[in-house]
Amino acid sequence: MRRLALAAALVACTLGGCDQKEAARPPPPVAMTRDVIGHYCGMNLLEHPGPKGQIIVGSLIEPVWFSSARDTIAFTMLPDEPKDIQAIYVSDMGRATSWDKPGTDNWIEARKALFVIGSRLKGGMGSEEAVPFSDRAAAEKFASQHGGRIVSFAEVPRDYVLGAGDGTTADESAPRHGTTN
């Protein structure tokens, strides 16, 4: 009887571990369609150049869409936005056709992306952009052609994202996203 109880407990622990691993996997990104509207701008995303973003929030049925990667990052910093974020995806510009056609299904998890900040190219609403890449070589090539520096998601300065958006507040000594300076 004791062996049976031990075996049942072992099976339950094993199955429970599988469920935890499955639950920890983020939901996949959603392909961008003609119908998606930017969360902050209220405009159709396909009408704007540059990288886009989507955040999958546990308490919402549909992804929250953004006309720029910068706005996507801003959502994660703002205190009044939902915090039950399951996944953050941004356009992988290394796989984009062009700046004007960033793609509809070339997403990368934002927390794994590299971002070029301070480049000469502007995002979907004409503001400074945090240009995402999955590949360091692609990010370096972009930075050499358009200016800027490469940072991780956690290193994107709060004032770069939440400032005026014109590059005048991007201070390298400013606290970074994901740090407690």
How would you label these PLM feature ranges?
Residues 1-16:
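Sec-dependent bacterial lipoprotein signal peptides
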Residues 18-21:
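Bacterial signal peptide processing site
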Residues 23, 46:
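Short functional micro-motifs and their immediate structural scaffolds
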Residues 38:
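Short cysteine-rich clusters marking metal-coordination/redox-active sites
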Residues 42:
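Cys/His-coordinated zinc-binding microdomains
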Residues 62-102, 106-107:
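Mid-length scaffold segments of soluble, non-membrane domains
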Residues 100-153:
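Beta-strand-rich cores of mature extracytoplasmic or soluble domains
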Residues 134-181:
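C-terminal partner/receptor-binding element of secreted or periplasmic proteins
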